[in-house]
């Protein structure tokens, strides 16, 4: 099933969080690429993901249009099978920070929350 290995994790804020993102899938990137986009506190993940599509999400912009990036704290590129990327993201304060995959259609299952206490 298409999903992140963890759909929730908790930290103490403020903090620098290291995210090691690895695509364990087998299908080609063009058909089943994945990314990790950590959104700012309070952002509606579903609305954000849908807005990415109407804002011009394409493979060239990693399915994260430039005008949508101000709503994110950090993101990876779209990864194909076996690819990995590490992010270090500042979590400034306590709150709930959603994360999603912005590859078209993936946000329904590939989502989660980072809870900062």
Q: Where does each model-flagged region fall?
A:
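N-terminal edge beta-strand
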Residues: 1-17
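Extended, low-complexity, turn-rich repeat/linker tracts enriched in Gly/Pro/Ser/Thr and Asp/Glu
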Residues: 25-29
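The feature marks short-to-medium sequence segments in extracytoplasmic or secretory-pathway proteins
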Residues: 34-69
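Extracellular/periplasmic metallocenter environments
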Residues: 22, 61, 70-117
């Amino acid at each position: 099933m298409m999903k992140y290995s963890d759909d929730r994790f908790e930290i103490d804020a403020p903090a620098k969080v290291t995210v090691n993102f690895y695509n364990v899938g087998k299908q080609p990137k063009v058909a089943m690429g994945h990314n990790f986009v950590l959104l700012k506190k309070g952002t509606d993940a579903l609305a954000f993901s849908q807005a990415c599509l109407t804002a011009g999400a394409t493979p060239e912009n990693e399915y994260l249009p430039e005008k949508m990036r101000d709503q994110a704290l950090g993101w990876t590129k779209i990864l194909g099978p076996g690819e990995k990327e590490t992010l270090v993201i500042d979590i400034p304060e306590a709150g709930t920070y959603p994360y999603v995959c912005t590859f078209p259609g993936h946000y329904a299952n590939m989502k989660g929350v980072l809870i900062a206490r």
